[in-house]
């Protein structure tokens, strides 16, 4: 593996994990804040709001896991190296 390809792969892996964590992190914070506000306004709808929140948090967390998978592929099974 050439030095330039190796350095670019490490940089791309770091960017993949970093950017994949920032977006869902902001989204999860916004969703949790909105859920707390909704439960405060309508306490009787807590179960429905909580279920929807947990499902949406799982989908958001999947985006972070996809970024981690991309980073691991770039580090250990690099398709750009012959």
UniProtKB/Swiss-Prot annotation:
InterPro entries the UniProt entry points to: ATP_synth_csu_bac/chlpt, ATP_synth_F0_csu, ATP_synth_F0_csu_DDCD_BS, ATP_synth_F0_csu_sf, ATPase_proteolipid_c-like_dom, F/V-ATP_Csub_sf
An annotated Gene Ontology molecular function: lipid binding
Subcellular location: Plastid, Organellar chromatophore thylakoid membrane
Bilayer topology annotation: Multi-pass membrane protein
Positions bearing the site annotation: Reversibly protonated during proton transport: 61
Gene Ontology CC annotations of this record: organellar chromatophore thylakoid membrane; plasma membrane; plastid; proton-transporting ATP synthase complex; proton-transporting two-sector ATPase complex, proton-transporting domain
Transmembrane segments: 7-27, 57-77
Keyword annotations from UniProtKB, A to Z: ATP synthesis, CF(0), Hydrogen ion transport, Ion transport, Lipid-binding, Membrane, Organellar chromatophore, Plastid, Thylakoid, Transmembrane, Transmembrane helix, Transport
Protein family (similarity comment): Belongs to the ATPase C chain family.
Alphabetical list of NCBIfam families matching this protein: ATP_synt_c, PRK07354.1
Subunit structure: F-type ATPases have 2 components, F(1) - the catalytic core - and F(0) - the membrane proton channel. F(1) has five subunits: alpha(3), beta(3), gamma(1), delta(1), epsilon(1). F(0) has four main subunits: a(1), b(1), b'(1) and c(10-14). The alpha and beta chains form an alternating ring which encloses part of the gamma chain. F(1) is attached to F(0) by a central stalk formed by the gamma and epsilon chains, while a peripheral stalk is formed by the delta, b and b' chains.
General function of this protein: F(1)F(0) ATP synthase produces ATP from ADP in the presence of a proton or sodium gradient. F-type ATPases consist of two structural domains, F(1) containing the extramembraneous catalytic core and F(0) containing the membrane proton channel, linked together by a central stalk and a peripheral stalk. During catalysis, ATP synthesis in the catalytic domain of F(1) is coupled via a rotary mechanism of the central stalk subunits to proton translocation.
UniProt xrefs under HAMAP family: ATP_synth_c_bact
Protein name, entry field: ATP synthase subunit C, organellar chromatophore
Source species: Paulinella chromatophora
Gene: atpE
């Amino acid at each position: 593996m050439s030095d330039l390809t190796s350095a670019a792969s490490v940089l791309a892996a770091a960017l993949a994990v970093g950017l994949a964590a920032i977006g869902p992190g902001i989204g999860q914070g916004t969703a949790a804040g909105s859920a707390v506000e909704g439960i405060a306004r309508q306490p009787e709808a807590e179960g429905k709001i909580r279920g929807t929140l947990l499902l949406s948090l799982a989908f958001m967390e999947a985006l972070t896991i996809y970024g981690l998978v991309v980073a691991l592929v770039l580090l250990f099974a690099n398709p750009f190296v012959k």
